Structure formats: C-alpha cells, structure tokens
Amino acid sequence: MKKISTTLLLLIIAVLCHAQMAEPVKFTAQLKTNGTADAEIVFTGKIDDGWHVYSTQLGQSGPIEASLTATTTDGIQLVGKLTPRGKEINKYDNMFGMTVRYFEHTATFVQKVRFTKEQYHLECALEYGACSDQTCMPPAEVTLSRKGKAPAFIAAKGNEATKADEATKADEA
C-alpha cells in the first residue's frame, strides 16, 4: 500500500510540475495577400514578461536566431530574406559575449513571397530562440501550411470576365 501511495504521489507531483511549465512565447502565422502576385508570410509572437525572442542574422556564436525554412514552395517563391519588424532591442549579452538583437512583449517576422502559378502549396516554419534572465527554451518553431488558388490569378480571371462582358455589350450596341 505504501508503494502505491508513493507512486501515486510522485505521479501527481510530475503532472503538477508539467502543468506549471508555461509556454512563454506564443506565435501565430498567416499568409497575407493583397489581390496581386505579391504576398507576405507574417509570424506574430506574444512574449511573456521577463522573456525575449532573438532577432534574425545574429551570427554563428550567438543565440538561436529567428530563421525561416520553406519545405514546400510549389507555385510560390520567396522574395528576399526573413525580416524582423517592430521594436528591436540591441544589447550586449555577457552569456554570449556579443551584442544581440531581440524583442520583448511582441515580435513580428515577415517573409515576402510571390505567386508564380495559379495553384500554390506552401509549407514553412519559423524557428526561434527565447530566453529569460534565468533560462533559455530549446529552439522552438511555428509552422504554416497553405494551398489554394493564387489571388493574383483569381483577380486576373475576374478582369478577363469583365472585359469579355464589356466586349459583348459593345457588340450588342
């Protein structure tokens, strides 16, 4: 009976400890289109107080920097590099022995893309590192997977239909 009680107590403690492990950074990902061939992949993170998310292109000896990996880009091409947006903090970090750039409270990373075919399929992931003054999370990632008809091609077909309607009306007049 004592072994069962001890095992049960250890199990309860493990569950409670796991429940207390908060996720200090929560990212959302979206593909923002504007009806043209150009669009943006936007990753927006909410960062808990006391934590920060590192920016892009920090160098090899630094912390885990934000980076984008695109595994599927059928009908869509990346344009340029992943770009940080928002209030970036530049600060010397004793742990890394270098000046690092990071975000507190919110972080936004944007990758420009261009649709190249009528149908597209995109799968990508943002990898990032986050730390507090006491600890760092292991590298984390947020994924985005989208497929469908490119907005620019939908708009172009709509314009062709409008022009055909106008030509028909002109012929009838």
Model-derived regions, located:
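Sec-dependent signal peptide recognition
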Residues: 2-10
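N-terminal hydrophobic targeting signals that begin at the initiator methionine
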Residues: 1-2, 21
